[in-house]
Structure formats: structure tokens, C-alpha cells
């Protein structure tokens, strides 16, 4: 059993035991980060809400990226959307309403992924797709984008596995079925069959 000690001066907790499990240490660190952020809040009627100025700035960057997309300035659009995503991830306080942050991040990441795929930046798109799946956005269109990206990177085995995972969730999805057939054809051609 781990004994926790609270330091009234620093407002942080520490484990007093010499041997502490890594998961316990991680939890303590997360509590301390959140506590430090909350203590800095000076509003006595505090309820966790997103910072309106920051939200407006993020929204403005994203919208300027979408305007650039409409004007066919794809690289500039990708730059603005990427900056909006980075701000949403790094500049928000840890206590801000996560229920607002996650859908916002999903929406912006999808747009960034589409831009990366259009510009042929498949590796960058693949990283963002993995991040999307890691945050729990398990939808057929995410698997379609990932499988398509893997096909363009000639990662046929992984593309097949991605299609199969997507079809396990949505067996009737025609795009995933078509990608699975294309993947099987590419694998057979690669193996000389």
C-alpha cells in the first residue's frame, strides 16, 4: 500500500514509499499537473469551461485554413489547420472541458488528414489517422482513409489488416470491401501470383 503525503507549501502530493509502481507515479504526476493548473485559477466562481479567447483563435485559424482550401491554396490550408490543431492540443488548460476538446480535435484532424491525402503527404496522414483511432474515433471512414493511405505507401499487409478491422465493425461498408479486394490484388501481384 502506498502512503501519500501532501505538501501544503507546494500544494503537491508525493508517495512516501521507496518503491512505487509506475502507474501510481504517473497518476500522482497527473494529479499534481491538474492541481497546479487549478490553483492558478483566480475566479472564485470557477467552473471548468474552455477559454473563449483561445477557442475563438483556434476557430479563426481553422476557418482561415478552410478559406484557403476553397481558394485552392492547399499548402497554406494545411499549415493553418495544423496550427489550429497544435493550439487545441497544447495551449488548452488540462482542466478545460474535455467533452468540448475531443470533438473539436476530431473534426479538425479529419480535415487535416484529407488535406494531407490530397497533397500526397501519406506518412503524415497515417500518423494522424493512428492518433484518431487512438482517441476512440472508431468509424468506417477512418478505416477507409487509413487503408487507402497504406495502399499508397505500399504497405499491403497492414492495409489488409486495416480493412478487415473496419469490416469487423461495418461488414456492409462497400468502400472497405473494395479496398480489401484491391489490397488482395496488390498482394497477389507483389507475391508473383
Curated annotation (Swiss-Prot):
One cellular component term from this protein's GO annotations in UniProt: rough endoplasmic reticulum membrane
Entry's localization field: Cytoplasm
Keywords: Cytoplasm, Protein transport, Transport
Keyword Cytoplasm attached: yes
InterPro entries associated with the record: TPR-like_helical_dom_sf, TPR_rpt
Record GO biological process: post-translational protein targeting to membrane, translocation
Subunit structure comment from the entry: Component of the heterotetrameric Sec62/63complex composed of SEC62, SEC63, SEC71 and SEC72. The Sec62/63 complex associates with the Sec61 complex to form the Sec complex. May interact with protein YLR301W. Part of a complex consisting of KAR2, SEC63, SEC66 and SEC72.
Annotated function: Acts as a non-essential component of the Sec62/63 complex which is involved in SRP-independent post-translational translocation across the endoplasmic reticulum (ER) and functions together with the Sec61 complex and KAR2 in a channel-forming translocon complex. A cycle of assembly and disassembly of Sec62/63 complex from SEC61 may govern the activity of the translocon.
Name of the protein this chain belongs to: Translocation protein SEC72
Claim: Transport is one of the keywords in the record: yes
Gene designation per UniProt: SEC72
Record organism: Saccharomyces cerevisiae (strain ATCC 204508 / S288c) (Baker's yeast)
Amino acid at each position: 500500500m502506498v502512503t501519500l503525503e501532501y505538501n501544503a507549501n507546494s500544494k503537491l502530493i508525493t508517495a512516501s514509499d521507496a518503491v512505487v509502481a509506475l502507474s501510481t507515479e504517473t497518476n500522482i504526476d497527473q494529479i499534481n499537473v491538474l492541481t497546479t493548473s487549478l490553483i492558478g485559477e483566480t475566479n472564485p466562481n470557477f467552473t471548468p469551461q474552455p477559454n473563449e479567447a483561445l477557442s475563438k483563435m483556434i476557430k479563426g485559424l481553422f476557418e482561415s485554413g478552410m478559406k484557403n482550401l476553397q481558394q485552392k491554396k492547399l499548402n497554406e490550408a494545411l499549415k493553418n489547420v495544423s496550427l489550429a490543431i497544435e493550439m487545441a492540443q497544447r495551449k488548452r488548460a488540462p482542466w478545460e472541458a474535455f467533452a468540448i476538446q475531443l470533438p473539436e480535435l476530431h473534426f479538425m484532424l479529419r480535415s487535416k488528414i484529407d488535406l494531407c491525402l490530397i497533397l500526397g503527404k501519406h506518412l503524415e496522414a497515417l500518423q494522424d489517422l493512428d492518433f484518431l483511432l487512438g482517441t476512440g474515433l472508431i468509424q468506417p471512414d477512418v478505416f477507409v482513409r487509413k487503408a487507402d493511405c497504406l495502399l499508397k505507401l505500399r504497405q499491403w499487409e497492414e492495409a489488409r489488416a486495416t480493412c478487415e478491422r473496419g469490416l469487423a465493425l461495418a461488414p456492409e461498408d462497400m468502400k472497405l470491401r473494395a479496398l480489401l479486394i484491391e489490397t488482395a490484388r496488390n498482394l497477389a501481384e507483389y507475391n508473383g501470383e
